[in-house]
């Protein structure tokens, strides 16, 4: 009987050990599978992080386009370009309007030996604006546009200040071109007019005046100053742009002192608004 009990106990012990061994194998297998899965996931995440995202590709493409060298157009090519197309030009600063600090832009009158350009609200820094002295060559990229007859570069930016030679244009005497189709071909150029007669304007109250603050007389000192001149029986509207020549400048004060009937000579830039509307920088009353 004792032998039978001993044999039974031995059998139970063997079964118990086998069960323990089986449990260990299962746990080991589970741990191994979990570890392998985790390592695979980490590897996949690592590979994914090394792949460029669509935004990365887009940024890389954009940066590449910035570095592409733009084709600089001659004045003839610029004039032949379609409206609303992007253009790049190089020309010399002849004058500039005040810097718009909030927008980071400036309006610049440009000219080379072949013609002139008007860069409206060109993006640049204050430091770049200060460096653009008369005669300085700059490169500008923007869109060729038309506004009320004026051909200009809009939404532009200063690409660079070009080191080297300088150029200051001599005014073209455009007096005899007044009233002709040829005058428009010199749009935005530095021009002069001689022997003009101050013609009357009508202010907001219907009174005759030699000049007006704003085109309709609704302004005050410090605003643009408009005045009429006549030549060969035709009357033209000229303006002193306050952002170009403020109320403290000689030309602004000279226009404020004009009298109807006086003979004057003028210099300025041949801006266009529904016809010739020069931005005047100098007025001299004939002796």
Describe the predicted segments one by one:
Residues 10-14:
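Hydrophobic alpha-helical membrane-embedded or membrane-associated segments
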Residues 23, 57-287:
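OB-fold single-stranded nucleic acid-binding module
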Residues 15-19:
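C-terminal motif of bacterial Sec signal peptides marking the signal peptidase cleavage site
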Residues 1-9:
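Positively charged n-region of N-terminal signal peptides that target proteins for export
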Residues 21-49:
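Short, low-complexity, disordered segments immediately C-terminal to signal peptides
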């Amino acid at each position: 009987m004792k032998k039978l009990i001993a044999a039974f106990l031995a059998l139970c012990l063997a079964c118990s050990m086998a069960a323990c061994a089986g449990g260990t194998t299962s746990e080991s297998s589970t741990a191994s599978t979990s570890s392998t899965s985790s390592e695979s996931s980490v590897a996949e995440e690592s590979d994914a992080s090394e792949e460029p995202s669509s935004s990365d590709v887009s940024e890389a493409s954009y940066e590449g386009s910035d570095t592409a060298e733009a084709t600089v157009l001659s004045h003839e090519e610029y004039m032949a370009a379609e409206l609303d197309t992007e253009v790049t030009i190089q020309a010399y600063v002849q004058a500039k309007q005040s810097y718009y600090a909030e927008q980071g832009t400036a309006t610049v009158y440009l000219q080379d030996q072949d013609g002139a350009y008007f860069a409206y609200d060109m993006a640049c820094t204050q430091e770049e604006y200060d460096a653009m002295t008369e005669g300085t060559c700059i490169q500008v990229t923007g869109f060729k546009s038309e506004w009320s007859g004026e051909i200009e570069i809009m939404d532009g930016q200063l690409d660079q200040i070009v080191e080297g030679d300088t150029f200051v244009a001599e005014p073209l005497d455009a007096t005899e071109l007044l009233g002709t189709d040829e005058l428009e071909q010199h749009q935005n150029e530095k021009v002069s007019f001689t022997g003009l007669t101050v013609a009357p304007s009508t202010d907001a109250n219907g009174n005759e005046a030699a000049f007006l603050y704003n085109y309709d007389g609704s302004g005050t000192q410090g605003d643009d100053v408009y005045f009429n001149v006549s030549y060969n029986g035709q009357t033209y509207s000229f303006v002193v742009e306050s952002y170009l020549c403020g109320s403290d400048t000689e030309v602004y004060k000279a226009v404020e002192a004009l009298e109807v009937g006086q003979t004057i000579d003028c210099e300025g830039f041949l801006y266009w608004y529904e016809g010739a509307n020069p931005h005047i920088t100098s007025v001299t009353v004939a002796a």
